[in-house]
């Protein structure tokens, strides 16, 4: 599947809608058992999103315009699919505040994470800022860590103080791994990004320097399945999430990758993560594609959707309020 980065992140397009399989998951058919989404994204409330927001798989246009609209639409999707906990990534500065805004909007549902990069144009935030946030309880997760976009691996010494901080506060670390949209390295935002730093094995140095870490290899390290398996085999403090491949890949390709991981014995280490980015409806597509995996038992689906993340992220059981409003529905900007 070839989608240029600018088109992928901004406009999507009906030209790739044929990649989606027919039969959307309507709200009435959505799973009613609770789900944890460990891979969500927040944007500043006043940020103007590139319009129109068009889902790159379905071609459906969204009416959202700002980061505030995006938050409202994502929370609606979470209620619709009974996602009772969501780990949301915000970047430095305003985007870090965006993660806090999500939490303030629905504190029982949202877990705030700090996205860090370490490139020249997106430097690492002051360590004291994160220390204070972890100490206050505002932050619970370090991630998404996008060292790959900085042309580095998480094992680079510049990240050591941040990983030590995560160890100190027993905070999970979520690391971007795998590949990136076509053309990423030619985008002014990401000239330092390199595919070579997406290999799961690049995490190994950090795991040995910081053995108390709990690490989520995001996107399941796709397409490097053997390396993802090797890391989980050797390090029992490593889990993976499904990430954007759960809805951006054609369903058969995603299922083949997921089946490989489960058949290899890692069904207790895979966590659901939608990685919806600009597209709130990507959340539902991701849920649908896991639900449609007929090779999974119901127990395995519950592990992926809830149990594995609840254990790894040490999340409390779903609050009754979160379950009671699971079927509500309102317009995305309502």
Residue ranges and their predicted role:
Residues 9, 75, 79, 87, ...:
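Non-transmembrane alpha-helical segments in soluble domains
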Residues 44-45, 95-98, 150-152, 181-184, ...:
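Short catalytic/ligand-binding loop motif for oxyanion handling, primarily in non-cytosolic enzymes
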Residues 22, 29-153, 157-161, 165, ...:
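Mid-domain alpha/beta scaffold segments of enzyme catalytic cores
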């Amino acid at each position: 599947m070839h989608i240029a980065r600018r088109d992928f992140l901004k406009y999507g397009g009906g030209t790739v809608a044929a990649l989606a399989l027919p039969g959307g998951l309507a709200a009435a058919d959505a799973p009613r058992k609770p789900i944890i989404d460990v891979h969500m994204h927040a944007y500043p409330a006043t940020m103007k999103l590139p319009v129109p927001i068009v889902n790159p798989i379905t071609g459906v246009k969204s009416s959202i315009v700002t980061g505030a609209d995006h938050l409202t639409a994502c929370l609606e999707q979470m209620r619709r699919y009974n996602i009772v906990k969501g780990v949301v990534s915000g970047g430095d500065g305003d985007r870090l505040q965006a993660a806090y805004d999500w939490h303030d909007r629905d504190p029982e549902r949202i877990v705030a994470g700090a996205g860090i990069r370490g490139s020249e144009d997106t430097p690492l935030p002051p360590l004291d800022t994160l220390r204070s946030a972890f100490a206050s309880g505002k932050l619970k997760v370090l991630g998404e860590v996008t060292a790959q976009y900085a042309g580095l691996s998480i094992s680079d010494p510049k990240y050591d103080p941040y990983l030590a901080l995560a160890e100190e506060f027993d905070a999970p670390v979520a690391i971007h791994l795998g590949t990136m949209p076509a053309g990423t390295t030619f985008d002014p935002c990401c000239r330092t990004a390199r595919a070579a730093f997406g290999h799961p094995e690049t995490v190994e140095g950090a795991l040995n320097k910081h053995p108390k870490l709990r690490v989520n290899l995001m996107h399941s390290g796709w397409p490097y399945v053997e390396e993802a398996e090797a890391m989980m085999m050797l390090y029992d403090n490593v889990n993976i999430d499904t990430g954007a491949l759960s809805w951006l890949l054609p369903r058969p390709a995603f299922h083949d990758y997921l089946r490989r991981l489960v058949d290899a014995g890692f069904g207790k280490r895979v966590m659901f993560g939608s990685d919806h980015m600009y597209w709130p409806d990507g959340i539902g597509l991701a849920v649908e594609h896991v639900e449609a995996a007929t090779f999974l038992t119901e127990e395995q689906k519950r592990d992926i959707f809830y149990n594995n993340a609840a254990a790894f992220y040490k999340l409390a059981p779903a609050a009754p309020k979160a379950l009671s409003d699971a079927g509500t529905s309102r317009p995305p900007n309502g």
